[in-house]
């Protein structure tokens, strides 16, 4: 091989055989048998090969699958409470990926079935966060779908196969990657049958969607148009095997507690023989959810076939005040840590006092929005401060106490050039 400096002695102008640039337009021109390549094309080739190796080479199978204990420990870092749900999810997810790694059939010829998951719990209890955290930890594609937007094929709304299309989009239409993914279908309780008895009128967003989801969740080869767009006969479809995809369905199931209570209630007779129960015996929604049975879900409006496709059912409890305070402070990406990091970018420290955290938790409890309501409370409390802080000078610390949360006072600003004075005012 020679470079352009050796060839230029002949006086002949040389060009790169790939991009056509002359030897004067590039730093280096490398010669081969009757061909030349410039340094820019070499760099481009290196980039292409590097990208292809990164995308094509699978992860080493020797990499150990995280054990249920390790999965649970990781969930503990991001999700507060819900210990039973974490344990159930850890075991179900571990078994699912162990099945994928070792094939559907054991050495004895036993076929391993797929165990999709149903999460039942009040709003803001951590259903979505659990699914997202699992997918991130396992480094698999993840997508969310809203069951309320789904309709039967042929009606206005989203087709159930759009769920698989979203998953493919997340992994650049790599079918093999998508088949290892996790799909979380939220608001699954909203597609319950409108009446317990089947109606003669079509229920395109309720029972119809459940019927459409059956095969997708159980395992079928879904035909998905590449790069989105509507289906048409001349189009080639991507074939995705959904039997390898883990489906997690979640919903608040408002009113399910009444169905369970009706079933478990004893002494419902009338007259002198009736058993009188005191108010103290009344169970909370979370306690009733733990006693859920398939028959309760059928009565609620899910069809038996659909419930059968979700064999792993776990419930999440309502978050109490102490749990909400922990959520504000303890997880790796806790809200107080997020806002503190934002303030740090403005060279200011953000401090929440203990009474402030309790007041925030109390407000969220009153709103009955669970952990989801915490961010909106903090946003409204810190709005003025976040608006003024970038323009202010010498603010070294912002202190939030209970009176600020209750709207009785403004956040305390401590200035770096008047520390003693600010401390005295405090």
Curated annotation (Swiss-Prot):
**GO biological process per UniProt:** cell division; proteolysis involved in protein catabolic process
Q: What GO terms fall under cellular component here?
A: HslUV protease complex
An MF annotation (GO) of this entry: unfolded protein binding
Q: SUPFAM superfamilies in the record, alphabetically?
A: Glucocorticoid receptor-like (DNA-binding domain) (SSF57716), P-loop containing nucleoside triphosphate hydrolases (SSF52540)
Keyword line: ATP-binding, Chaperone, Metal-binding, Nucleotide-binding, Zinc
Chaperone as UniProt keyword: yes
Which SMART domains does the UniProt record give? Answer: AAA, ClpB_D2-small, zf-C4_ClpX
Name the positions where ATP binds. Answer: 122-129
Asked if the record carries the keyword ATP-binding, the reply is yes
A single Pfam family it belongs to is: AAA_2
Q: Which InterPro entries match?
A: AAA+_ATPase (IPR003593), ATP-dep_Clp_protease_ClpX (IPR050052), ATPase_AAA_core (IPR003959), Clp_ATPase_C (IPR019489), Clp_protease_ATP-bd_su_ClpX (IPR004487), ClpX_bact (IPR046425), P-loop_NTPase (IPR027417), Znf_CppX_C4 (IPR010603)
Domain called ClpX-type ZB: residue spans: 4-57
Task: Report residues binding Zn(2+).
Answer: 16, 19, 38, 41
Q: How does it assemble?
A: Component of the ClpX-ClpP complex. Forms a hexameric ring that, in the presence of ATP, binds to fourteen ClpP subunits assembled into a disk-like structure with a central cavity, resembling the structure of eukaryotic proteasomes.
Q: What does this protein do?
A: ATP-dependent specificity component of the Clp protease. It directs the protease to specific substrates. Can perform chaperone functions in the absence of ClpP.
By sequence similarity, the record places it as follows:
Belongs to the ClpX chaperone family.
- The protein here is known as ATP-dependent Clp protease ATP-binding subunit ClpX
Q: Please report the organism this UniProt entry assigns to the protein.
A: Vibrio campbellii (strain ATCC BAA-1116)
């Amino acid at each position: 091989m020679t470079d352009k400096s050796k060839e230029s002695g002949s006086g002949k102008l040389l060009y790169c055989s790939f991009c056509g640039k002359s030897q004067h337009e590039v730093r280096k021109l490398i010669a081969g048998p009757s061909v030349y390549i410039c340094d820019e094309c070499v760099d481009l080739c290196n980039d292409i090969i590097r990208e292809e190796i990164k995308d094509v080479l699978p992860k080493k199978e020797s990499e150990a699958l995280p054990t249920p204990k390790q999965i649970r420990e990781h969930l503990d870092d991001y999700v507060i409470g819900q210990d039973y749900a974490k344990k159930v999810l850890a075991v179900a997810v571990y078994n699912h990926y162990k099945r994928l790694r070792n094939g559907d059939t054991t050495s004895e010829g036993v076929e391993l079935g797929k165990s999709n998951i149903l999460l039942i719990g009040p709003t803001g209890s951590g259903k979505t966060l659990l699914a997202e955290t699992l997918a991130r930890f396992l480094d698999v594609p993840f997508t969310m779908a809203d069951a309320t937007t789904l309709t039967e094929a042929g009606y206005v709304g989203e087709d159930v196969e759009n769920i698989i299309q979203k998953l493919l989009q997340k992994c650049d239409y790599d079918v093999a990657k998508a088949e290892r993914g996790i799909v979380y279908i939220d608001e699954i309780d909203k597609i319950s049958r409108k009446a317990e008895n089947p109606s003669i009128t079509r229920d395109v967003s309720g029972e119809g969607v459940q019927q459409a989801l059956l095969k997708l969740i159980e395992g079928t080869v879904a035909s998905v148009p590449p790069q989105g767009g509507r289906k048409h006969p001349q189009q080639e479809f991507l074939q995705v095997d959904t039997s390898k995809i883990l489906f997690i369905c979640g919903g608040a199931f408002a009113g399910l507690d009444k169905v369970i209570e009706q079933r478990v209630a004893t002494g419902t007779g009338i007259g002198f023989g009736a058993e009188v129960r005191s108010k103290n015996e009344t169970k909370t929604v979370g306690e009733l959810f733990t006693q859920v049975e398939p028959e309760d879900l059928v009565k609620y409006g899910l069809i038996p076939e659909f419930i059968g496709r979700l064999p792993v059912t776990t419930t999440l409890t309502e978050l109490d005040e102490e749990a909400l305070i922990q959520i504000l402070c303890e997880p790796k990406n806790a809200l107080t840590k997020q806002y503190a990091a934002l303030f740090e970018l403005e060279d200011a420290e953000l401090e929440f006092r203990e009474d402030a955290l309790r007041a925030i938790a109390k407000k969220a409890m009153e709103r009955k929005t669970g952990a989801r309501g915490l961010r909106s409370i903090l946003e409204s409390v810190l709005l003025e401060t976040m608006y003024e802080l970038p323009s202010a000078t010498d603010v070294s610390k912002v202190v939030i106490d209970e009176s600020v949360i209750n709207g009785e006072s403004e956040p305390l600003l401590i200035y770096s050039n008047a520390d003693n004075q600010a401390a005295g005012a405090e």
